[in-house]
């Protein structure tokens, strides 16, 4: 489960490696309630309740080498992928009419499965792009290339997103976010502990490997590593910490375009916004404002050649999962094994499926819903959500430490929740997306451009609150603070989380936990900063806010005492689970 915060569209992915035999979908038993085989009754619940409750399940479901962790969510995702596979494979074997959604889904999946073509092509699909980066000669040309990569779903230096203005949530606004780190988190670059140092060395090896695969000499690869690490460490040094990123007020900086340009000269901003097709915007939200000022100073201390190495690596790393096996292996060895702890690459069909799910998410979702999600499930879920809203409202009313004024506002927010169940009322139109038989990467690239253009079309327009932040076939759920909505896609509304034929007690104990978790996000340390309309607004009395923080700190301390992670980063989900 997650709280949906705006996340920049970044090219990522999974591509080709080995084939896999077809496996029949395992249909979940419709009338199973609590499976006693999941228990370990040899252990007394008072001695080790976790082992008692989950021991049997863990024994019967050992960790698979393609996973770094495996639980009921992962098990449901596996079953979900098998279901979607049966829907898609027929389309790849018997494509529909040219230009139809079925043809696009089938062709993209088939290209992801075509290991012969992928390995014959090598890195030919990106050669023209590499040449374009290599010939950059001026700041304006560099700026245009940054915009091009952003429009193709990558995020060199920073990321651009269009979403709700957090203090005027009915309108969309251009938002700029810190980004540009291949390892994701700034701490990997800045900490000097043994683990961070090993991660940096593995990252350098990954960079070297990619540049070697495109024919760079050892000297060129070394120069690339030095340039990329110099730039990315500089980006890390001016990036907000994870704790600071959780502070909604600190990350809201709406200003005029002219005001933003006056504060930094990172790029030629007129050229950038023109290249992005946004010549007429007047305002933006520069999320981490000091980041862009720091990045401007960094750019002055790096050469154009160093910046070109950095952009080249952004392209290589983004495209690697969609190229030949050596590129896929390099990507998996670093991001899959080193960073994530997985021992084996997922089979080719799962990776191709993931690409199709990303490129034509709602088209696949429409097929999935028609096959696996009856209308009766939606009706039952709506009743459960209503019951749990009432239960949460009763709990809010009974809080002894909260004032009546804050309680009234909390009840208003709870009553105003937008509830989304199963699938959107209106499906997206993919007629403008071209899927061709040129190359797998070319199709991923076109898909990314299609998605970014879809997002850019919302600039300075009203927020469409009927849109979904997840596809129906996603095994997850979310709360979005700027729309004050809770969403439960069809794929999570399957056994063991939801079973329309099971006893109510089972459903309230399973999906009910998920519903309660997401609703509580509206009142956690981040969600509580947004009002019933989704605006970033302080609706708590000062005394109540202090009492909330006092209790939150105690919860954080409790988790700090038992787990070896920063409790501040887990508080949102910890609080929702309590």
Predicted region positions:
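Positively charged n-region of N-terminal signal peptides that target proteins for export
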Residues: 1-4
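Bacterial N-terminal signal peptides
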Residues: 8-15
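C-terminal motif of bacterial Sec signal peptides marking the signal peptidase cleavage site
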Residues: 18-19
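Short, Gly/Pro- and small/polar-rich lid/capping loops
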Residues: 25-36
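Active-site-surrounding "flap" and adjacent substrate/cofactor-binding loops of secreted or lumenal enzymes
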Residues: 45, 52, 56-109
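Noncatalytic, helix-rich "gating/capping" subdomain that lines the substrate-entry/channel surface
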Residues: 91-383
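Intrinsically disordered, low-complexity linker/terminal regions across diverse proteins
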Residues: 228, 263-266, 285-289, 346-353, ...
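A short, hydrophobic C-terminal helix/tail in secreted or cell-surface proteins
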Residues: 574-578
């Amino acid at each position: 489960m997650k709280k949906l915060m705006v996340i920049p569209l970044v090219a990522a992915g999974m591509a080709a490696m080995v084939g896999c035999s077809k496996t029949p979908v395992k249909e979940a038993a419709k009338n199973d309630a609590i499976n006693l085989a999941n228990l370990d009754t040899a252990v007394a619940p008072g001695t080790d309740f976790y082992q008692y409750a989950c021991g049997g399940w863990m024994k019967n479901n050992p960790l698979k080498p393609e996973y770094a962790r495996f639980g009921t969510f992962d098990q449901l995702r596996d079953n979900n992928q098998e279901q979607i596979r049966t829907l898609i494979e027929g389309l790849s074997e018997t494509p529909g009419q040219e230009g139809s959604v079925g043809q696009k889904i089938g062709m993209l999946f088939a290209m992801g499965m075509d290991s012969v073509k992928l390995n014959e092509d090598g890195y030919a699909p990106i050669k023209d792009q590499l040449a374009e980066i290599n010939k950059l000669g001026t700041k304006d040309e560099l700026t245009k290339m940054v915009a091009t990569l952003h429009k193709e779903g990558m995020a060199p230096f920073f990321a651009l997103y269009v979403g709700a203005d957090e203090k005027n949530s009915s309108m969309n606004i251009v938002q700029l976010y810190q980004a540009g780190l291949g390892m994701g988190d700034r701490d990997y670059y800045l900490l000097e502990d043994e683990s961070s140092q090993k991660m940096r060395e593995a990252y350098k090896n990954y960079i070297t490997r990619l540049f070697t695969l495109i024919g760079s000499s050892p000297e060129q690869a070394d120069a690339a590593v030095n340039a990329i690490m110099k730039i990315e460490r500089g980006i890390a040094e001016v990036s907000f910490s994870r704790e600071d990123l959780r502070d909604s007020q600190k990350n809201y900086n709406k200003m005029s375009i002219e005001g933003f340009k006056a504060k930094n000269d990172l790029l030629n901003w007129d050229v950038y916004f023109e290249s992005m097709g946004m010549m007429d915007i007047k305002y933006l939200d520069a999320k981490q404002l000091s980041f862009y000022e720091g990045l401007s100073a960094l750019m002055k201390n790096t050469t154009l050649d160093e910046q070109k190495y950095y952009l080249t690596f952004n392209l290589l790393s983004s495209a690697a999962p969609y190229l030949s096996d050596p590129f896929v292996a390099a990507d998996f060895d670093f991001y899959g094994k080193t960073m994530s702890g997985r021992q084996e690459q997922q089979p080719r069909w799962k990776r191709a499926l993931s690409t199709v799910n990303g490129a034509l998410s709602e088209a696949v979702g429409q097929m999935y819903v028609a096959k696996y999600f009856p209308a009766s499930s939606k009706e039952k879920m709506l009743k459960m959500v209503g019951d749990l809203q009432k239960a949460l409202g009763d709990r809010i009313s009974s809080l002894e430490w909260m004032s009546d004024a804050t309680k009234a506002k909390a009840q208003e927010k709870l009553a105003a929740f937008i509830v989304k169940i199963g699938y959107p009322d209106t499906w997206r139109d993919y007629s403008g997306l071209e899927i061709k038989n040129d190359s797998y990467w070319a199709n991923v690239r076109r898909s990314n451009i299609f998605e970014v253009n879809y997002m850019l079309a919302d600039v300075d327009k009203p927020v469409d609150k009927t849109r979904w932040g997840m596809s129906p076939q996603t095994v997850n759920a979310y709360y979005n603070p700027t729309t004050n909505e809770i969403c439960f896609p069809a794929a999570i509304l399957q056994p063991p989380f939801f079973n329309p034929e099971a006893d109510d007690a089972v459903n309230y104990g399973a999906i009910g936990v998920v519903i309660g978790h997401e609703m509580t996000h509206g009142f956690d340390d981040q969600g509580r900063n947004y009002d019933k309309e989704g605006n970033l607004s302080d609706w708590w009395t000062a005394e109540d806010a202090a009492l909330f923080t006092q209790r939150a700190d105690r919860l954080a301390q409790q988790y700090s005492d038992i787990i070896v992670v920063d409790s501040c980063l887990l508080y949102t989900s910890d609080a929702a689970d309590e």
